[in-house]
């Protein structure tokens, strides 16, 4: 009777006592630490049938062992843990469950970040530095981190203490996807950076222009295709087409390679020197010009005809000099005095007589010139004397004489003209005054 009374008094005390509790160590827990859970009874009370739970879900069962090794802790190891087990009290055994314990796993260092200096798109031949950056937790700053670098699935540098990798004289072949990995020395944590694309910018080579048309020179209405290609150069590449330095079209090649321009020949103005230009972020190059001739065209608008431009002013100047010389000559000829009146040709069968005409012209005080002209005329021509004009050139000149007079022979500056007939008397001839 006394035994049952003692048991009844003991049971309420059991309900009020925390018989189990869960411990996690180390504390605090960092990534890579060996995480251990221990389910312990009050005052080291023996336990059996121990079960572990995380976030209310069954995790592990052990008949006798009260300790559970979780291995290297990770961020995914965080959670609320608890345990349960059978507690043995004389003379009975009952099952108890511990309170939950929150396990926080601290990040040892954040994932690294890879950067390229001075730029992930460096110019060909420049120095490129890859830098892998991260930082240890202040409570674990005494650890030593090791760095490794990789590209397109290949290891460029094994683990070492240097967080940088230098690429001297970058080439187009150095373009690709890079990343780095960081791990503490002797630890099991390893973190990888996001991939970084490095694109080495190579200058474009001189493009090659090709003309495609029929076997013969194209005519108006035919189609002509221009192909432009730069053998090397980092994309994207912008291609521009020119006709005699005037742009006629452009195309972009996002991946590089060849681009084309197709157009119909509309007129002879489509003939000339064609060229193309390739340009990227580094350089710009122009191709050799290609001449397009049209069938039956006489004149091509090509830069070769530009040589006429510098000679045009010289030609005009030469013409002006010749015109001025002619003008001076005509004016000096006119100052020399008018020529005698021209005599029209005599009518057929008419009698002719000689006609002498002297013209005296004094240019200065001490000199003079006498012009003598001999004509033959007849009386029948008198009726047509009104038709005489200066523009007639068919008069018959028998002889002409130019004689210079001395000052003693000239009495005045007036012009003295006289005419005389032949000494032989002619019935149909008469004296004519000019």
UniProtKB/Swiss-Prot annotation:
Name recorded for this polypeptide: Fc receptor-like protein 6
UniProt keyword Repeat present: yes
Record topology, Extracellular segments: 20-307
Protein's organism: Homo sapiens (Human)
Pfam family, one: Ig_3
Tissues where the protein occurs: Expressed by cytolytic cells including NK cells, effector and effector-memory CD8(+) T-cells, and a subset of NKT cells (at protein level). Also expressed in gamma delta T cells and in a rare subset of effector CD4(+) T-cells (at protein level). Expressed in spleen, skin, peripheral blood leukocytes, liver, lung, bone marrow, small intestine and placenta. Expression among T-cells is greatly expanded in HIV-1 infected individuals, and includes not only effector and effector-memory CD8(+) T-cells but also populations of CD4(+) T-cells.
Predominant location: membrane
Organism taxonomic ancestry: Eukaryota, Metazoa, Chordata, Craniata, Vertebrata
A GO BP annotation: immune response
